[in-house]
A protein has these predicted regions:
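Hydrophobic anchor at the start of a short beta-strand
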Residues: 24-25, 57-59, 117, 146-152
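Short acidic-hydrophobic, aromatic-tinged amphipathic segments that line or gate anion-handling sites
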Residues: 78-88, 118, 131-138
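Conserved catalytic-core segment of nucleotide-activated headgroup transferases in glycan assembly
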Residues: 20-71
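A generic local structural motif
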Residues: 13-14, 45, 85-88
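Glycine-rich loops and low-complexity Gly/Arg-rich segments
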Residues: 50-53, 110, 124-127
Length: 174
């Protein structure tokens, strides 16, 4: 939904880098909990397969630092099982041609740093300005980032706005 940029400019404004033309692809898979919730446990395997069929670029996969495995116990309850992940250094956005993610919030950092996003069409906030067909990895969309950030800003509120009804009012406008 189109929103004015006032909230973005007041609360979230930051420098937005020009679009970059890096060489590699950054893949940010959903956490195990998200993959389980959305029933996309095969997302990473399918995504890598699609990317390899459509590009010869280097693909870096970066898991979230804390990503416990979700399992079902003997009575059928969902439980988490801690599993170590490799925490890589800070992302060097200059290296990347695109970020591919299911619905990671890191897409905001990617877009802010000038790296276009490929994402899930239904479950990612970046979908309105990003390519959702991963087979088009060589032709990213370069959408209006400020419009997206402005829309996202209208879904974040201060404690005062939650207490005084502003948040509720904005939610009911949508």
């Amino acid at each position: 939904q189109q929103r004015p940029s006032d909230r973005y400019e007041k609360y979230f404004k930051q420098d937005v880098a020009p679009w970059k033309k890096g060489k590699k692809i950054l893949v940010l898979p959903p956490t195990n909990a998200i993959a389980n919730f959305f029933n996309v446990e095969d997302w990473l395997d399918q995504t890598i397969k699609t990317l390899k069929q459509n590009t010869d670029r280097v693909i870096d996969v970066r898991e979230k630092p804390y990503n416990p495995t979700i399992e079902t116990d003997h009575v059928g309850a969902t439980v988490k099982v801690d599993r170590p992940t490799v925490h890589k250094a800070k992302i060097n956005w200059h290296d990347y041609h695109a970020t591919v993610t299911y619905n990671s919030n890191t897409m905001v950092a990617s877009l802010t740093n000038g790296v276009p996003v490929f994402c899930d069409p239904q479950n990612s906030a970046a979908a309105p300005i990003s390519e959702t067909n991963f087979s088009k990895i060589e032709t990213p969309k370069y959408g209006d980032r400020i419009a997206l950030f402005s829309s996202l800003a209208y879904n974040n509120w201060t404690l005062e706005e939650m207490a005084n009804g502003t948040a509720w009012s904005m939610l009911n406008e949508s």
